[in-house]
C-alpha cells in the first residue's frame, strides 16, 4: 500500500467507526519496504528461471533443486525449507492440489498438467512470497480458463488495493471475478502479511464482503494469492503430502 499523509486522523476516525485498524507492528518503514522489494526481485528471478526450464518429463524434485540452487546463487535463502517442518525449498501443486504440495522424485510432469510453483525467499533478512501457474504443453480449454481467471483474480485484487479502504474491498473484487466465471475461492486458506517474517498478520481472506476486515494503510505489505477452484470451495488435507 503506497504512502500517504494524515495517518493519525484517519486512524482515529476509523477506530471510532468500529473498523479494524492495523497495529504499528504491521506497518513497515520505507527502509524495510525497500528491503522487501529487493527480496521480491530475487523471488521473481527464481520464478523466471523456473519458467525458462519447466517442461513435461521432469520431476517436481527437479523444480525444487532449481529453486534451491538459483535462490542461493542470487544470495538468498529458500524460506519454506524447514519452516514448520516443511522438507523442501518450494511448494509444487499439480492439477487438483490446492497448495503446499511437496516436491518428489516420483511426481513427473505430464503434457496437459497445470502446476503452481510457490516460491518464497529470504534475502538480507527480508521475506518475499509469490507463486506462478504453469501450463505444461497443451492442455484442455477448461484448464486454460482456470489458469487465466486465477491470474485475473489477482489483478482485480491488486487494482482494489488503495490506502484507507478495506481488505474486504480487495476480497470482494477477487471473489466477484471468480464467481462471474463460475469458480469458487478457497475459504480456509488465504494470504498474509509478509516482510520481516514469512507469515505475519493480517490473515488475508478473499471471500469477505466489501467494507469489512482491516483498514489498508500506507506501509502494509501482504500477499494476494487467492486459491481459485473449479467446483466447490471445499478442500481437505492429504495425509501423504
Q: Where are each of the predicted segments found?
A:
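Acidic/histidine-enriched ion/cofactor-binding microenvironments in catalytic or ligand-binding pockets
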Residues: 93-126, 201-241
